[in-house]
Amino acid sequence: MATVRICVCGDESTGKSSLIASLVKDQFVNNKIQPVLPQITIPPSIGTPENVSTTIVDTSARPQDRTTLRKEIRKCNVILLVYADHYSYERVALFWMPYFRSLGVNVPVVLCANKSDLVGQGTTPQVVEEELLPVMAEFREVDSCIRTSARDHRNVNEVFFLCQKAVTHPIAPLFDYKEGHLKPLCINALKRIFYLCDKDQDGYLNEQEMRDFQARCFDKPLTTDDLDNIKLSIAKSLPASDLEKGIDLPGFLQLNKLYAEKGRHETIWIILRKFHYTDSLSLEDKFIRPKFEVPEYSSAELSPAGYRFFVDLFLIFDKDNDGGLNDEELEALFAPAPGLPSSWTDSSFPSSTVRNEAGHVTLQGWLAQWSMTTFIEPKTTIEYLAYLGFEPSNPKDSITAALKITKPRKRRSRLGRVERNVVLCYVLGASGAGKSALLDSFLNRPFYGLYHPTIKPRRAVNSVELPGGKQVYLILEELGELEPAILENRAKLDACDLICYAYDSSDPDSFSHIVDLRKKYPHLDELPSIYTALKADKDKTNQRCELQPDQYTSSLSMSLPLHVSVTWGSISELFVAYADAATTPSTAFPRSNEEGPDRTSLYIALGATACAGVAALTIWRRATNAL
């Protein structure tokens, strides 16, 4: 916010214009001033909240000026409502506050008891108790109240500072004065902040964690005396607190409640804004959704910093050290986020990744799941990195430092290995071919033999070690009833690294589905592919199609189908073959007999010959010149 616009309202002769003049002149103006002062703008100075400019608009309460008054009230950020005697005080509740509500404005109101220099006005505690607090209790939009005197120049600067602070650090979203407690949204935000600062997740902010919190929020060290005073304040309100271990969540919330009760709500706002909260107590959109675009033919992956963050997160929340995250540990881990990512719920997490015998997500499965999420929905990963507290090593970097963009692989047929650590393979085939069992086997699940048709798309992700030792994450996706829509979607196919054509070698009608599929979608020829004969533990049968699978693949100058069974221990070699083909796509392309020869080597040879000829000519010319 660049400017705070203050609308000064109140009955006639309450001293509105005198307050403004006293602020500008820094003293009381004895000369008669005009009934309504022109609008003034004051630039920010030292101590101005959030370094904002301030525009002050004087108004008239006369009925003939009501149109202008309505217009100014609707344009302002805060209303300074001034009264000066019993009559104008009564009008605060009877006219002014209902009038503001009738206009539908939702701005804070600062209530000002002016002309405190006059005899018979009472003491400040008496005025606060008898006049100001009842109005604040009745009208929640009243942010604060103060006694002033333009003649004595008493609290003149302070009243306008309160107006500025009511906009830059509003109390209304934080604290309910009537009920005397922090509001739910504020509590939720502070709970998340506590969670992020409790680095060891023991339920307490220890001395070092408090010092780190102080440095982050207030850019100054926390002395031992300061920490002792904080603990003393908490102990007075919560005598049962165990402050020897540190400050627990109830103590942290109580501390912030004390700030609100003492009018130090700007302290709470400093904390909230350091953790990227807006005035509506939601996280800043630019924080959880920073700009991040994946160029065409490229993909997104976790960077080393991103993997390190998720490894650390796993180790912290695996409280029982059993090597897996159970439901309670996952719930605690995702406490500062709005639950699991919706894509995880849709894919029936954790069944989409690696689990141990107890059904708990292993570290391998945890990293594989995030690798898949980053590949398919990088913006979801970025959003959850923000929720879960990722902090880049360089303060100038954004959360996107946890991700990296791969080199584009526009020409899949180019020789060599693509620089990708996460690859996607679509598993296509007839119903009952064994695709679901293949995905289960990929996740080390036992084979049950019961057939359940796949309706929704299903994914499985796991790490695979390539020949040479490099590890990649392989995503196998069974398309279900969305198969036609996905195979017609060029963007979906561009994201795919490999097609696995799977058929049941014991079913005579299984392979014809693949033949028909390739005829229906000829653009599938543009993708690298592998043919897989599943259920090889059963008796092999001839397929009812023009060419048998071996003949069909040979006619395409491709490798013969890989014969495997999910009941065999060697099934893991199949997934290595998939990952290897996905990362070296030139080895898995169909080539028809009509396709011309690969002239790459010829072009290289001709280029070398031409370079040699130019060099020889240059040497001959130099030799001739030398003669």
Swiss-Prot record:
Stretches assigned to the EF-hand domain: 185-220, 305-340
Example of a GO MF term: GTPase activity
Binding site for GTP 2: 429-436, 465-469, 534-537
Cytoplasmic-side positions: 1-599
Compartment annotation: Mitochondrion outer membrane
Topology of this chain in the membrane: Single-pass type IV membrane protein
Residue ranges the record marks as coiled coil: none
Main location: mitochondrion
Keywords: Calcium, GTP-binding, Hydrolase, Membrane, Metal-binding, Mitochondrion, Mitochondrion outer membrane, Nucleotide-binding, Repeat, Transmembrane, Transmembrane helix
Similarity comment: family membership: Belongs to the mitochondrial Rho GTPase family.
Protein's name according to its UniProt entry: Mitochondrial Rho GTPase 1
Chain's gene name: GEM1
